[in-house]
């Protein structure tokens, strides 16, 4: 088995080195099993600084980014100014200096003070660490495996509602997080995609700013967050919590071509007497069950209330043990 970091990934050498060394310390040497696409773009130290500068400039209108430099890196990628992993093998110093100079000019125009001396030194050291891995044309490798009939499991990041095209724009990430992103992020044909598993929580969460029609601001929302340990994986920020939004879920099923749904974290709702599910939005007094062009604070969620199952689902060993109320909840969602 091998692992491949595809062309659609934005690779931060610093974070990569930290994770790889952590794995090595636990007895998992990945240098022989992990390949990296030459076409993956590199997150530069100045990308992180730009991320912070842009957020600071937005003031109260900030999006709430992770601060990892994702947006600025995608900006360079789309404007054809990016630095890629494969550039490590060809004129890297020249390409890096050109990108850095452009970033510094932008930062001067924003009057943003910064010092990347230490970060840059660590970043350059991490680049040397990166070179020990096999840098490949990943699209050829992956497609050859598919031709040989081997199984390929693709893993993306983030949910449908953070997709740059179909999410709650502008409070989204900078890439396509839907199923189709697998094709462009790995270089495989849509014909090679088999089953599409849609994984969702039994409730809704969101990190950072942006619209959230079913968000709960009371003790129920706090309880869901505490029981679900809802904190951002990257930033550690407390996630906003709310009831399940079936308007958004149906939209995600449609956009991704989901063939099977998988619900997780149902045990978080074990202790609730009743559970709500949003089945429609009320916009300007009119109900709709179609996800709209834009979501704002004026949207009212229309709920159906269902009885809770009041059972510890972590003790369940088979579907036959599911309580009647839980099965009713599943049937309603279906």
List the predicted regions and their residue ranges.
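Non-transmembrane, aqueous-exposed alpha-helical and coiled segments at domain scale
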Residues: 1-334
């Amino acid at each position: 088995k091998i692992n491949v970091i595809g062309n659609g990934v934005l690779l931060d050498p610093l974070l990569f080195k930290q994770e790889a060394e952590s794995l090595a310390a636990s007895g998992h040497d990945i240098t022989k099993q992990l390949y990296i696409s030459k076409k993956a773009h590199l997150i530069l130290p100045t990308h992180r600084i730009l991320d912070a500068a842009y957020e600071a400039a937005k003031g109260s209108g900030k999006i709430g980014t992770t601060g990892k430099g994702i947006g600025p890196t995608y900006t360079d990628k789309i404007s054809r100014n990016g630095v890629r992993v494969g550039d490590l093998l060809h004129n890297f110093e020249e390409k890096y200096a050109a990108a850095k100079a452009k970033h510094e000019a932008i930062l001067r125009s924003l009057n943003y003070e910064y010092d990347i001396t230490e970060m840059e030194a660590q970043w350059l050291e991490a680049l040397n660490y990166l070179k020990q891995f096999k840098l490949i044309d990943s699209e050829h490798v992956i497609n050859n495996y598919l031709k040989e009939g081997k199984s390929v499991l693709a893993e993306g990041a983030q949910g449908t509602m953070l997709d740059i095209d179909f999410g709650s724009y502008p409070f989204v990430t900078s890439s396509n997080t839907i199923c189709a992103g697998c094709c462009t992020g790995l270089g495989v044909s849509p014909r090679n995609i088999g089953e599409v598993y849609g994984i969702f929580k039994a409730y809704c969460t969101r990190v950072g700013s942006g619209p959230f029609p079913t968000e709960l601001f009371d003790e129920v929302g706090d309880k869901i967050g505490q029981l679900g340990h809802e904190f951002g994986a990257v930033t550690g920020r407390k996630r906003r919590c709310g009831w399940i939004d079936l308007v958004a879920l149906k939209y995600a099923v449609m956009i991704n071509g989901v063939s099977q749904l998988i619900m997780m974290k149902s045990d978080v709702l074990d202790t609730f007497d009743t559970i709500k599910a949003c089945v429609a939005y009320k916009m300007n007094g009119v109900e709709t069950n179609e996800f709209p062009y834009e979501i704002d604070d004026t949207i009212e969620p229309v709920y159906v209330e269902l009885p809770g199952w009041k059972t510890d689902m972590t003790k369940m060993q088979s579907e036959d043990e599911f309580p009647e109320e839980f099965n009713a909840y599943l049937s309603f969602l279906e």
